[in-house]
Amino acid sequence: MKGLRKSILCLVLSAGVIAPVTSGMIQSPQKCYAYSINQKAYSNTYQEFTNIDQAKAWGNAQYKKYGLSKSEKEAIVSYTKSASEINGKLRQNKGVINGFPSNLIKQVELLDKSFNKMKTPENIMLFRGDDPAYLGTEFQNTLLNSNGTINKTAFEKAKAKFLNKDRLEYGYISTSLMNVSQFAGRPIITKFKVAKGSKAGYIDPISAFAGQLEMLLPRHSTYHIDDMRLSSDGKQIIITATMMGTAINPK
């Protein structure tokens, strides 16, 4: 299909988890932790959209299949308006919602439940852009050189800390079907490999910020960082990560 290519990629599965990372489409500072794990690698194929019209058509077709209830749609719309607040609370409490205001508990429960209906029908590549704080506060002021390129010493330090590690995100993870224009100025691009049948929902049709081709991933998800490399112009770190799944499975 023109505008759509299939990439042969290496999956790395692992056992174990770590600590919180990100969530809105553009990320705010937070602490992150990682540890080494046992690995098992194998090859698979993922679809990567390069044409915006085809990406929208695919996403809209998926959205029509979900059959979300009115309350589930309202919870998603509300989330897109206040993702930072919701995810901030989830990270602060390590995913535990006991003690949250009753309306927020209800919203989180509805969001979690909606993922029972939102699953990807095929292996697919998703994207998100982040600032240096994604790697932790220690990189916030050291990752970029004055000319906008990635500092190689800081990059090697980040690789030593995160490459071939698992990361656990207590909040929801906003991604896009394409490496869209709003990521152009972001120094970190993560390419998520999401396997067929994984919980992931195309929510752009009802997002408060439509046009980002947004795919939402569930909270308390773990992903494995398979690869970290510099872009050809040296201005971005390209991370490839495999989504491992979520520990949240509501009935």
Curated annotation (Swiss-Prot):
Known catalytic reactions: L-asparaginyl-[protein] + NAD(+) = N(4)-(ADP-D-ribosyl)-L-asparaginyl-[protein] + nicotinamide + H(+)
Give the signal peptide, or none.
1-40
User: Which top EC class is named for this enzyme in its record?
Assistant: transferase
Give EC number(s), comma-separated.
2.4.2.-
Q: Which keywords describe this protein according to UniProt? A: Glycosyltransferase, Host-virus interaction, NAD, Nucleotidyltransferase, Secreted, Signal, Transferase
Q: Which Gene3D superfamilies match?
A: Toxin ADP-ribosyltransferase, Chain A, domain 1
A GO cellular component annotation here is: extracellular region
Q: What is this protein called?
A: Mono-ADP-ribosyltransferase C3
Task: Tell me which species this is from.
Answer: Clostridium botulinum D phage (Clostridium botulinum D bacteriophage)
Gene that produces this protein: C3
